[in-house]
Amino acid sequence: MTDPHLNTPQVSTSPTFERSQDFLNIDEPPCAQETPSVSTFNLPGPSAPAQSVDKPVPMIRRRSTNYMDALNSREQARERESSIGEHAPGAERRSSGPMDFQNTIHNMQYRTTNDSDLSHAGVDMGDSISHTPICSRAGNRPIFKNSYLDNNSNGNSARVPHGSPPQLGTRRKSSFKYEDFKKDIYNQLHMFGEK
């Protein structure tokens, strides 16, 4: 009794088996296919074959991003601005160039701004937030605790009492808290103590 699932296909009935025999017959190998030449492969010109009607689209040269080109175009933009400024001194004109974005960033970083430029005190939209000043403008002296002031001087100098470390702030970074916690655990477990 033979199982029909275990039988191999007959040579005469399987077309894929017949095609695979082409590569197994070493006495008569198949012919090599011709490799297309690079000089005649879809290139426009006199040596290209006229087989296809559609010519490939030539590569479009993008705007140069070389440093010298950018500097030259920046100088040309400055010259245009100066000539425009001479003809119309009251009007503020702006020309865009290849380095317009970089110039904008540079101007934002290095331009000095006044508080009056940024304040909106004259505009009342009903949704403004009034900011209270942190320190009074009446006195420029820093405010110290009375225990730190020197009673012998006129109040311009301050001294720190000996024996107590100065408090820099009440809030410590979480990394310091973690380091203190580790130190306490190591001390309790005597991990790094001498044996």
Curated annotation (Swiss-Prot):
The modification Phosphothreonine is found at residues 65, 132. It is found in: Cytoplasm. GO terms for molecular function: enzyme inhibitor activity. The keyword Translocase does not apply. The modification Phosphoserine is found at residues 64, 95-96, 164. Its main location: cytoplasm. GO terms for biological process: glycogen biosynthetic process; negative regulation of glycogen catabolic process. Keywords: Cytoplasm, Glycogen biosynthesis, Phosphoprotein. Interacts with GDB1. Present with 639 molecules/cell in log phase SD medium. This is Inhibitor of glycogen debranching 1.
